Regions:
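N-terminal Lys/Arg-rich, disordered targeting/topogenic segments
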Residues: 1-11
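Structural microenvironment flanking redox-active thiols in thiol-disulfide oxidoreductases
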Residues: 105-144, 152-160
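Conserved redox-active cysteine motifs that mediate thiol-disulfide chemistry
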Residues: 87, 95-112
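N-proximal helix/coil linker or "cap" segments that precede and/or mark the start of modular domains
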Residues: 33-70, 139
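Hydrophobic membrane-insertion alpha-helices, especially the h-region
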Residues: 15-31
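Thiol/disulfide oxidoreductase modules built on the thioredoxin-like
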Residues: 139-146, 152-199
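Short pre-active-site segment immediately N-terminal to redox-active cysteine/selenocysteine motifs
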Residues: 89-91, 95-99, 165, 175
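A short beta-strand-turn-helix
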Residues: 65, 70-91, 117
Length: 202
């Protein structure tokens, strides 16, 4: 009888909720996809918005000059591109990894943004897998039903673009200057991002 009473005391709302929260935290810790999904839900309620510079017809977009060095990437077909050869194009460049929860969370919004510009010869997307594992990245894109173009680094990346934090997103103007730099996950479905790219692409 005493044992039954002890069991009833143990099965309190407080104890059960503590167990549920502990399990949830452990799942978030060990399953980056679940954590990514949680962040994605928060994006839908207006959190994790990118800090896009204000644009007006009367003022130019503030920019930072491009680093004076070659920046090379290899695409999924094995072709190497030089960033300096892409002058005349607005470059949306994202540094990510398949195991990074904020990267996973923001990918669908970047994919939708890419869909708007994939046929625009003046805008280019470069999704850089920082681990340099092309096959794993392509498998990730296929599994998530994403059509983003994957690249890996073929040389040193200037710290002005990427200093180790993931995800990192930069947007370069048509002259190769740094017009936007954001650390951490963000919702790139925000109309301000589209307006910003459109302004740069004019």
């Amino acid at each position: 009888m005493k044992r039954l009473e002890d069991n009833k005391k143990w099965f309190t709302f407080s104890n059960i909720s503590t167990i549920v929260m502990t399990v949830f935290v452990l799942i978030l810790f060990f399953r980056p996809e679940v954590k990514g999904l949680v962040i994605q839900r928060l994006m839908k309620v207006g959190l994790f918005q990118p800090d896009v510079p204000e644009i007006s017809e009367a003022s130019s977009v503030p920019v930072q000059q491009a680093p004076n060095q070659q920046v090379l990437f290899t695409d999924q077909k094995g072709n190497t591109i030089n960033l300096s050869d892409q002058k005349g194009k607005v470059i949306f460049m994202n540094f990510w990894a398949t195991w990074c929860p904020p990267c996973i969370a923001e990918m669908p919004s970047i994919d939708k943004l890419y869909a708007k510009y994939k046929n625009n010869k003046n805008v280019m997307f470069i999704m850089v897998d920082v681990d340099g594992k092309m096959e794993a990245s392509l498998a990730f894109m296929k599994k998530k039903n994403l059509s983003l173009p994957v690249y890996i680094s073929a040389g040193a990346i200037p710290k002005e673009y990427f200093s180790g934090s993931m995800p990192t997103t930069v947007i370069l103007d048509k002259f190769g200057n740094l017009a936007f730099h954001h650390l951490g996950g963000a919702d790139y479905g925000n109309p301000e991002v589209t307006a910003f790219i459109d302004k740069l692409a004019k």
